Amino acid sequence: MRPVVSTGKAWCCTVLSAFGVVILSVIAHLFNTNHESFVGSINDPEDGPAVAHTVYLAALVYLVFFVFCGFQVYLARRKPSIELR
């Protein structure tokens, strides 16, 4: 199997996706626990767990991108490079 994207783009996507998964998971957890700073104001949503569910789904999308891009990095590293003699 051949990689779909270049190695540099795959690494960039992998790092950004990992960051997205971590940040969105933390935000979703804070909504799920009805943290004061996320649901305590007048303009904030009242149903924290419903918002947390949506944010967890967004983190899942980032996780899929993380797996895909990580697999692209694996494929690029596995491919033998050209050797000059």
Curated annotation (Swiss-Prot):
Q: Give the membrane topology.
A: Multi-pass membrane protein
Q: Which residues cross the membrane?
A: 11-31, 55-75
Q: One Pfam family name from the record?
A: V-ATPase_su_f
Can you cite a GO biological process for this protein?
Golgi lumen acidification
Extract the GO molecular function terms from the UniProt entry: proton-transporting ATPase activity, rotational mechanism; RNA endonuclease activity
State its location(s). Endoplasmic reticulum membrane; Vacuole membrane
Give the Lumenal compartment stretches of this protein. 1-10, 76-85
Q: What is its main location?
A: endoplasmic reticulum
**Parts of the chain on the Cytoplasmic side:** 32-54
Keyword Ribonucleoprotein listed? The answer is: no
The UniProt keywords, alphabetically, are: Endoplasmic reticulum, Membrane, Transmembrane, Transmembrane helix, Vacuole
> Subunit composition?
V-ATPase is a heteromultimeric enzyme composed of a peripheral catalytic V1 complex (components A to H) attached to an integral membrane V0 proton pore complex (components: a, c, c', c'', d, e, f and VOA1).
Name this polypeptide is given: V-type proton ATPase subunit f
Q: Which organism is it from?
A: Saccharomyces cerevisiae (strain ATCC 204508 / S288c) (Baker's yeast)
